[in-house]
Amino acid sequence: MQKRAIYPGTFDPITNGHIDIVTRATQMFDHVILAIAASPSKKPMFTLEERVALAQQATAHLGNVEVVGFSDLMANFARNQHATVLIRGLRAVADFEYEMQLAHMNRHLMPELESVFLMPSKEWSFISSSLVKEVARHQGDVTHFLPENVHQALMAKLA
């Protein structure tokens, strides 16, 4: 049986840090679903459809990645996708407490759902979508932190 994992997030937009995590996840699992949350309460810069398209382009080189948008409860989404693993990125110790709460709630809702925490490579450990957008808004150079297609889309949004 294939081991299916979900890497959920808002990915507004997807960064090279996210690509680092999903790339390493593809080496551990047979099939990785990059699950892009609608997250309307976060007021994303990019629509769900735009985020899905950007992520599909940025992960096209990874043969066992599927990009899907969702707005369901994570445990329900995982059950519907026949996935038993959630991949979560941890940039800093500060992320751990919140991630632990999520992991426990998800396990309560779906006991067979395991959370696997991956640290980004050192090069990406300090970046987030929010930080990249903020730097770009102030004309800072963010080309190193984003896939090329995402960088172009971000610059177009900010123009």
From Swiss-Prot:
Its EC number is 2.7.7.3. It comes from Escherichia coli (strain K12). It is found in: Cytoplasm. ATP binds at residues 7-11, 18, 89-91, 99, 124-130. This is Phosphopantetheine adenylyltransferase. InterPro entries: Cyt_trans-like, PPAT, Rossmann-like_a/b/a_fold. Substrate binds at residues 10, 42, 74, 88. Optimum pH is 6.9. Coiled coil: none annotated. Feedback inhibited by CoA, which is competitive with ATP, 4'-phosphopantetheine and 3'-dephospho-CoA. Binds 0.5 CoA tightly per monomer in the same position as 3'-dephospho-CoA but in a different fashion. Is inhibited by the very potent and specific inhibitor PTX042695 dipeptide, with an IC(50) of 6 nM, a compound which has no activity against porcine PPAT. A series of pyrazoloquinolones were also characterized as ATP-competitive inhibitors of PPAT. It comes from the Bacteria. Crystallized in the absence of Mg(2+), the catalytic metal is not bound by the protein but probably by non-esterified oxygen atoms from ATP and/or ordered H(2)O. GO terms for biological process: coenzyme A biosynthetic process. Belongs to the bacterial CoaD family. The record marks 18 as: Transition state stabilizer. Its main location: cytoplasm. Pfam families: CTP_transf_like. The keyword Metal-binding does not apply. It catalyses: (R)-4'-phosphopantetheine + ATP + H(+) = 3'-dephospho-CoA + diphosphate. Its cofactor is Mg(2+).
